[in-house]
């Protein structure tokens, strides 16, 4: 018969977060992979030297095989549409900026990283980052450190947390600036996108 001490140790070990390669497979199995995922975001950017954070909020959509829509509604309306081949910034119905991957090679990398972060694409993230993950109950967290020096210089380190979807993203930039993004009110399926968002794709 197991002693109370051994039983207690088993419970203690079971409650510790899992780490290493195995948890990444567990995390990947926990994440749903809908064709369409939309929700609201709340973003806080803390800049070095500024006491108050810069806050913004809006809606986002991640559409498989198409890209990402990032619509800032507050404090100023601004829309970013990121696809495999381009980044388009829109103000109202007007295109304010267009960056094409055939002219700017980094466009494809930026879009790949953002899509993987929002969708929780562990396989894609493993190609670009050194990943350390942990799982506790129905939640998980991972930290990302870029493998390529150029990407590391631009991004720094990233922390993700979530369950069946990514729920928060924190980016620690090399400059010391920090961006925290909470993803809330997440919906999936074609009905998750409103009419205006669907038109942008």
Residues covered by each model-derived region:
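Bacterial N-terminal signal peptides that target proteins for export
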Residues: 1-7
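Amphipathic hydrophobic-ligand
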Residues: 52-59
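N-terminal leader/targeting segments and the immediate start of mature chains
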Residues: 17-40, 46-52, 197-201
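Short hydrophobic/aromatic-rich beta-strand segments that constitute the beta-sheet cores
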Residues: 41, 62, 68-72, 87-89, ...
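Flexible, surface-exposed loop/linker segments and immediately adjacent secondary-structure boundaries
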Residues: 94-141
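Bacterial N-terminal signal peptides
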Residues: 8-15
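Gly/Pro-enriched, hydrophobic low-complexity segments
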Residues: 122-201
